[in-house]
Design a protein with these regions (language model features):
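A residue-level marker of the well-folded mature domains of exported/periplasmic proteins
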Residues: 1-164
Length: 164
């Protein structure tokens, strides 16, 4: 039987839609099943509540994808309060230091994470500025890759002094 996955989205935006569409495309043709997808508003308290609902509704969840590490924190707390830590893995995103540390320590509940590079923001700002000051049209699609963080490479993404 394939893995059963619960998804926590951010807010209804283009960015969130693109992440979810890419996630769904990656699963296409696999035996993995998306149980549910709800918005948690990029917020750990909302994510906690959504995850509590998932835990009550679904007796079997193999994995949870929280589209951001702040939401993953709320998800992890809900799972811990339900005593189901050994039943599912959680994947977030953004490279929050507390999550990266747990990956470094080989926490079985947090096998991987992904970066959302600051270059995404600086590139978008630069292209927006060029659009206003240049006569050249700024068109096209730009993809800035994220990095997969694993126990083997987590140390290079761990910054203990980071505020995030």
């Amino acid at each position: 039987a394939g893995a059963k996955i619960a998804v926590l989205r951010g807010i209804p935006t283009t960015l969130d839609n693109e992440r979810v569409e890419a996630f769904q495309a990656a699963l296409e043709g696999s035996d993995k099943e998306i149980l549910d997808m709800q918005y948690a508003n990029w917020n750990r308290d909302d994510a906690f509540n959504v995850m509590q609902d998932y835990l009550a509704k679904y007796p079997e969840i193999d994995a949870v994808w929280a589209a951001d590490d702040d939401m993953a924190v709320g998800v992890l707390e809900a799972i811990a309060q339900a005593g189901r830590e050994d039943q599912m893995v959680v994947v977030g995103g953004a490279g929050m230091k507390d999550i990266i540390k747990r990956i470094m320590d080989k926490d079985p509940q947090l096998p991987v994470n992904v970066t959302y590079p600051p270059a995404l923001i600086s590139s978008a700002i630069e292209m927006t500025a060029l659009n206003f000051v240049s006569s050249a049209p700024m068109t096209g699609r730009y993809i800035i890759s994220s990095q997969l963080i694993t126990p083997e490479n987590a140390e290079q993404y761990y910054f203990p002094e980071s505020p995030f």
